[in-house]
């Protein structure tokens, strides 16, 4: 399905009351991630993979100049993307499921991991987070996170 210009792939939506994990990906459908998650037999999981992310904008909480020659700057569009998640994307995902999930988590790696943690400070739609190798180095993030309160 396509919502707000993002391709969304949902795996395991037949699992009623399963936990819902939302992953933002640079590109791809996340089938391999879902297959790996299926190895955890004791927990029913639904995975929603959102692709076509503008990585240097939507995953970043602030601006950052290019890190190396030929790199693009980060433009700090995370708050706008969070509003899209709240208003359109997550409701569309929930409408596709065969029941309400036990909880909704967000997971990400690199800038996606930074975004996952940042989102806990900005929205109540996620009650769990996983950040794999999150970009905690992002300029000003540690200071910013020390000033914000999680909902």
Go through each PLM region and give its residues.
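Non-catalytic cap/lid and distal C-terminal segments of serine-dependent acyl enzymes
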Residues: 1-151
């Amino acid at each position: 399905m396509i919502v707000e210009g993002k391709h969304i792939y949902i795996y395991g939506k037949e699992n009623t009351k399963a936990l819902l994990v939302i992953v933002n990906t640079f590109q791809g459908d996340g089938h391999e991630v879902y297959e790996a998650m299926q190895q955890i037999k004791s927990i029913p999981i639904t995975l929603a993979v959102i692709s076509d992310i503008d990585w240097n904008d939507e995953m970043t909480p602030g601006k950052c100049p290019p890190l190396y020659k030929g790199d693009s700057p980060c433009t700090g569009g995370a708050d706008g993307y969070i509003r899209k998640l709240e208003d359109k994307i997550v409701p569309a995902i929930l409408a596709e499921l065969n029941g309400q999930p036990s909880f909704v988590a967000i997971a990400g790696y690199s800038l996606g991991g930074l975004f996952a943690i940042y989102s806990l400070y900005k929205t109540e739609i996620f009650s769990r987070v996983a950040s794999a190798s999150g970009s905690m180095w992002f300029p000003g993030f540690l200071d910013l996170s020390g000033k914000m309160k999680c909902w």
